[in-house]
């Protein structure tokens, strides 16, 4: 037993130097071992290290492929080597497969999302993918032009019979007075068109429209133009739904066909309205002149007494005074009634 114990102690003492030599040789082997190129998904810091890394990966891939057996999916083989697998994916991205899957695919944008080592170059590639087809945006103006040409070829909504203007030189607007009826100036059996204006002389909107409406007979000599005071022809205003002035209606014969609903009441907008409804083009070089400012439709406000407004104010004041007097009398009666109940 003593010999066995001394033998174990001797082996332990002799084993210490051998263990130290083994550790020294291990450190030496690790120091002599070449450090592989820094890569995360085959992103190298420079081109030389990338080339060295590819050569080392190629040598390692050969025994791996031999151990896996016959040829299989190259992506399965390269999955053992992260750098080579990522190079294969980057090659597919440049071939166009990633663009079909969209930018949200992690295989396409993995490098930029991890470290952003490629810088602005990656964003430039994306912009090229986004704006690679400018022809789609250029096709829209063509479609718009086709739509405009189609609208211009549409038939007018109202087929107006143009009147004969041979021998006529003065084309003016006719204003109806209180005794005249609108139906007397419209032909119920005909298809000629007339533009009728409902206005009031004290309305500032009617006054601002007057010069533009006065110039319309010169722009459309084959059409008729009438104007009437809506306050004097209340029955006609109610019949044709005139709740506000100015109100412009287009008549074909004695039938109203269209109403002008634009807030911008100018000569140009009126020309467009008539052309869209009848298809009749206005004469060129027709503008609002100084004579149109003077008449026949007045362009200045006419100051008159509105008797209806005066009566309304008188009634309102009378009612307020009566209510005030009755309230005071009620206040005097209430205390007396309380005393009677108390007795």
Curated annotation (Swiss-Prot):
Region annotation (Disordered) ranges: 86-112
UniProt GO cellular component terms: ciliary membrane; cilium
Residues exposed to the Extracellular side: 21-304
Residues listed as glycosylation sites in the UniProt record: 170, 177, 189, 276
Biased composition regions of type Basic and acidic residues, renumbered to the chain: 86-95
Ranges in the topological domain labelled Cytoplasmic: 326-343
Top-level taxonomic group: Eukaryota
Transmembrane feature ranges: 305-325
Keywords for this protein: Cell membrane, Cell projection, Cilium biogenesis/degradation, Glycoprotein, Membrane, Signal, Transmembrane, Transmembrane helix
Localization of this protein: Cell projection, Cilium membrane
SUPFAM superfamilies, per database record: Thioredoxin-like
UniProt-listed InterPro entries: Thioredoxin-like_sf, Thioredoxin_domain, TXNDC15
Role of this protein: Acts as a positive regulator of ciliary hedgehog signaling. Required for cilia biogenesis.
Protein name (database record): Thioredoxin domain-containing protein 15
Organism of this sequence: Rattus norvegicus
Taxonomy of the source species: Eukaryota, Metazoa, Chordata, Craniata, Vertebrata
């Amino acid at each position: 037993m003593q010999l066995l114990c001394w033998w174990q102690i001797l082996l332990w003492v002799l084993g210490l130097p051998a263990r130290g030599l083994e550790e020294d040789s291990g450190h030496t082997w690790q120091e002599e071992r070449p450090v592989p190129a820094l890569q995360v998904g085959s992103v190298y810091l420079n081109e030389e290290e990338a080339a060295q890394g590819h050569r080392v990966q190629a040598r390692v891939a050969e025994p791996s492929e031999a151990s896996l057996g016959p040829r299989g999916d190259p992506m399965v083989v390269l999955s053992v080597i992260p750098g080579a697998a990522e190079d294969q994916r980057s090659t597919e991205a440049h071939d166009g497969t990633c663009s079909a899957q969209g930018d949200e695919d992690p295989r396409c944008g993995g490098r930029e999302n991890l470290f952003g080592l490629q810088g602005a170059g990656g964003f430039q590639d994306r912009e090229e993918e986004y704006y690679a087809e400018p022809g789609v945006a250029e096709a829209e103006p063509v479609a718009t032009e086709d739509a405009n040409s189609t609208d211009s070829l549409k038939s007018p909504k109202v087929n107006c019979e143009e009147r004969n203007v041979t021998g006529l030189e003065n084309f003016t607007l006719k204003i109806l007075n209180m005794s005249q009826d609108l139906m007397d100036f419209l032909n119920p059996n005909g298809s000629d068109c007339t533009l009728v204006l409902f206005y009031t002389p004290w309305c500032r909107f009617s006054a601002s429209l007057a010069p533009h409406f006065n110039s319309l007979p010169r722009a459309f000599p084959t059409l008729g133009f009438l104007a009437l005071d809506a306050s004097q022809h209340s029955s006609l205003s109610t019949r044709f739904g005139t709740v506000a002035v100015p109100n412009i209606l287009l008549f074909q014969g004695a039938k109203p066909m269209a109403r002008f609903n634009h807030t911008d009441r100018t000569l140009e907008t009126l020309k467009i309205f008539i052309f869209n409804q009848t298809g009749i083009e206005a004469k060129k070089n027709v503008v609002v002149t100084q004579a149109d400012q003077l008449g026949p439709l007045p362009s200045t406000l006419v100051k008159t007494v509105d008797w209806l407004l005066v009566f309304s104010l008188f009634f309102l004041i009378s009612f307020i005074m009566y209510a005030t007097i009755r309230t005071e009398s009620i206040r005097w009666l209430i205390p007396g009634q309380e005393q009677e109940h108390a007795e």
